[in-house]
Amino acid sequence: EDFKTDMDCAVSIERRIAAMKQVYAAGIRTVCFVSPVFPGLTDFEAIFARVKNQCDLFWLENLNLRGGFKKTIMDYIAVKHPGLRPLYNQIYNRHDRSYFEALMRQAEAMARQYDCPFVDNEMPYGRVPQGHPIIVNYFYHEEIRGSENTGARHKKEDK
């Protein structure tokens, strides 16, 4: 909650989860969009445990740092979470994808553990059995932009 407050002025996480539960109970398809996943800070498995019985889709998107926003976040990490500076340097200055590749494998394993579908850049519609939301990988947004959620990615080697 403290981290959320540092990042935005929206209502509390508890209020968001309570609202999601009410909407889900009313029969409306719900999505838990975990975005951005901050390396070393966002525990998406803990979030999943809290919401899996009240959402149909569980989206994951990594933190993308572009433009002036990069300096703002890197400065925030340096001040508030200095122990994470090497990790953020590895990811955002050295362009090492291994952290998020490992998180993707972790999300796939979580999907298997909870018998949930795992899709890459897709937008499935409809309700799912309670407790088995579809886990959607939206890591590396720059690769999926313009793909219309078809599952296609535009990797550097594809260009």
Segments predicted by a language model, with ranges:
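Conserved AdoMet/S-adenosylmethionine-binding subsite of the radical SAM
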Residues: 1-106
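C-terminal accessory extensions appended to soluble enzyme cores
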Residues: 70-159
